[in-house]
């Protein structure tokens, strides 16, 4: 048996390459390459296309007559070729058969056919007619001359006639010449021989384009390819989106698994909503219903707490979170929270135990506040207190990151010293009555001042002591014992009482009207509010100058001027603010706003000079010499202003005292009435204070801190003293790191205690309480507030002595740049201008600028009441006896100041701002 491989026996796996052989074993040539095939196809298609252009369609119509006389038509289609000897035109006519020899007859006597016939000529073999009389082309010409519209030649027996016809292409005939052969020629000759009547119609049709179907194929192929590409791209995009969606869904599921779920408990109100910690239940805070299904929370229901502290039913919010990955309320993305510190929560359930401090701020009232600079936003949270009132919590967990907001914080904010908080809430229990906020009057604006005050013995959350606050920055509270080298702790801080760990940010500067309680000649420095107080408000006014219901008869009164100003001029000052506290009685729901004019301050003749400075700081002060302040820089700024309260007969104020009477513009004092004029500086207490009523608590014995009745600073502020001293070593008021500085006569008196940083806007209340012996003509609610603003970002033009530069001003509205130079005309500096006139001016407290001041000098009285010139010597002696502990030199300087302002200040008695 032969091997299948066909090879040698020793190589069975080897195969032979068989050659292609023909039937007899000859080798076949390899197949032609593809370009060669394409060339052949084009070459073959070329002549075919040329022949297609020469094709002539001959339509023969036969007319057969019937016995009835009707004609029956039969159409036969034939195909021929146009000869180059004639034109390629369409022709039609009756078919006439002609013999070739008949065309050779030149006898003109023969009848000529009418024009419009088609001649059909059958050519014979060349052997039968070796010497023709005319050529084929000549015969065609003879037929056209005799009136033929077209000539058809049958060349089946004489194919050479085609070449003879093509030779006449130089001078072609104007009528078509067509030749037929083969089967078409046989059909034509049969019709001509058998039929008597027939018509021929020759048509020249345009040849079909060979690329017609080819172009359609290209278009279809291109369309299919583009469709496939688009389909592939769509599929890829869809798959990518599905993968991304699956990834996002996985991340959402992971984030959802990490979120906490708690059970709702409506009984425990002490816990704040969204607080961090291992709490299994949520209390009923300000929101007790689900924002998705709008149903109330039921005890025991499982709630989902989103990192943005919003809570919803778990069954309601989970599908939304899985699909949209954002909080339905605030659009907080639950997936993109990686790398962010997130919301910092503070557990406030144990605040009463003193574990963690908290800053409680009231809810904002409606209004527009103009900031003087951009303040970075710090996290706040609105919660409910124990009485069900919403409060704003400023919370920020430090965790050792002291520079958390330092890149975004302005320079003046970073310059504030940290708070030193070393007392807690736990030791002191406020025994005063806390009045809960009445839900019947939500967000009702107060009757007087920019914040409401409580008639009860203590403050509620809406009527708290933080009646008007303005953040200048935030600093971290330091533990007790930590000291900043640049700032020496001076005195007891009267800021927010912390407890335990210092993990919260506290405001370093807050504008607060200090608590005052006037009870017929007695003054309590830290009692709760019982009346209307004027505070620095940043709200825009409601044009109180147009009040027509008050007894001032449409005229406004500026506290620092004895002249009457028309209200139309004052009302235009609403956008700038002013020192005036004119009360509009049109509605009890709007604030009396603070105004400020744009003109320079005018020191009226006869008004007393500015309050005297200690002898070590000024040589001319204290001797009754006229005071001239330095020139003021440009800009619409607020200088030292004296703010006063004003009653009107129609204003909706609280009930006055039984012995009070209505006056047109101010306070009426009966002649000869002895006034107990006191000037109280509201500052820090002698010890830790209550968080709600700020009632001072005594320091523990042995603490090494001594206080006096003068009080201390209420809030911390920037460092006010810089090294801007003359060669004599006398310290002077210089620039500070904060935005605002404090005029020297706003420093509180603290005997035995070192000074602490002071707030930018300190409040001085000048109380006029009627003596106990005479009980008519004095309002217990009337008072005056003196506010001093000082620009401390920029250093003064020169180092002036102490607080002499009263014209240093700050911009209240940043956009107001086209203001006048100088101080406002309706504002007085601290020029000993009493709200009741020049005779009731007060003396500045003696300030001690160096730390080496003796104890006796520090224990000098802070204030001394000026004696009214119209009072009797007995009354004057009685008033001076109350402050007999003052040093003799200070009393003498005050007496000189009173004498210097004697006649000019007399008419101010009996008038109010």
From Swiss-Prot:
Residues 13-27 have a biased composition (Basic residues). The keyword Cytoplasm does not apply. PROSITE patterns: ZF_RING_2 (PS50089). Residues 238-913 are cytoplasmic. It is found in: Cell membrane. GO terms for molecular function: frizzled binding; ubiquitin-protein transferase activity; zinc ion binding. Belongs to the ZNRF3 family. Interacts with LRP6, FZD4, FZD5, FZD6 and FZD8. Interacts with RSPO1; interaction promotes indirect interaction with LGR4 and membrane clearance of ZNRF3. Interacts with LMBR1L. CDD domains: RING-H2_ZNRF3. It comes from the Eukaryota. Negatively regulated by R-spondin proteins such as RSPO1: interaction with RSPO1 induces the indirect association between ZNRF3 and LGR4, promoting membrane clearance of ZNRF3. Keywords: Cell membrane, Developmental protein, Membrane, Metal-binding, Signal, Transferase, Transmembrane, Transmembrane helix, Ubl conjugation pathway, Wnt signaling pathway, Zinc, Zinc-finger. Residues 634-664, 881-890 have a biased composition (Polar residues). The keyword Zinc applies. It is a single-pass type I membrane protein. Residues 903-913 have a biased composition (Gly residues). GO terms for biological process: limb development; negative regulation of canonical Wnt signaling pathway; negative regulation of non-canonical Wnt signaling pathway; negative regulation of Wnt signaling pathway; protein ubiquitination; regulation of canonical Wnt signaling pathway; regulation of Wnt signaling pathway, planar cell polarity pathway; stem cell proliferation. Residues 1-32, 601-669, 855-913 are annotated as: Disordered. This is E3 ubiquitin-protein ligase ZNRF3. It catalyses: S-ubiquitinyl-[E2 ubiquitin-conjugating enzyme]-L-cysteine + [acceptor protein]-L-lysine = [E2 ubiquitin-conjugating enzyme]-L-cysteine + N(6)-ubiquitinyl-[acceptor protein]-L-lysine. The chain crosses the membrane at residues 217-237. Residues 1-52 form the signal peptide. Pfam families: zf-RING_2, ZNRF_3_ecto. E3 ubiquitin-protein ligase that acts as a negative regulator of the Wnt signaling pathway by mediating the ubiquitination and subsequent degradation of Wnt receptor complex components Frizzled and LRP6. Acts on both canonical and non-canonical Wnt signaling pathway. Acts as a tumor suppressor in the intestinal stem cell zone by inhibiting the Wnt signaling pathway, thereby restricting the size of the intestinal stem cell zone. Along with RSPO2 and RNF43, constitutes a master switch that governs limb specification. Residues 53-216 are extracellular. Its EC number is 2.3.2.27.
